[in-house]
């Protein structure tokens, strides 16, 4: 928790410094909302040795930002990714499960607070093209079901505080006075969940520790305030 508060405070300080610099310029605050579709990277369940695939998830972000210059802006966003799972059925290869057909799923619960910066690369009459990056704290945990959940069939890991990273490429167009719509691709690394040991057939077996990285396509709105 101390790590989470420290990173959050640092993020807020950086954003505040950027805003203080921008106050001498004739720029504006904005609110933003984003939603879309995400797919997690394939990952291996180390407990049973099965490689998992992602179904579709929904990333959602809310934020507040400031136009620092004509082609530069920064914002602070609170986001999550909901509804997605890493899952797979197949033959286990690790000890304790070798040769067993299993069905396993990992459902993450992610909450992230990111400070993001963006630069417009080109500005056309109808739209802009921009790149950006973000960093900040993320709380990550997961619900594991199936063979990897072992004796209870289902197990939950505790929240782990990670540093989340985000890379962004997108385009934006003004649709009304003070309102812009965005279409963007982003890659997010939220880090690994906690691992834990559970007892299976008299032996201590490690589960959890899944890494969550995602590819995201989102549509967003920026409202000047």
Curated annotation (Swiss-Prot):
It holds the Pfam family OmpA_membrane. GO terms for cellular component: cell outer membrane. InterPro entries: OMP/PagP_b-brl, OmpA-like_TM_dom. The keyword Protein biosynthesis does not apply. Keywords: Signal. Residues 1-22 form the signal peptide. This is Putative adhesin RT0816. It comes from Rickettsia typhi (strain ATCC VR-144 / Wilmington).
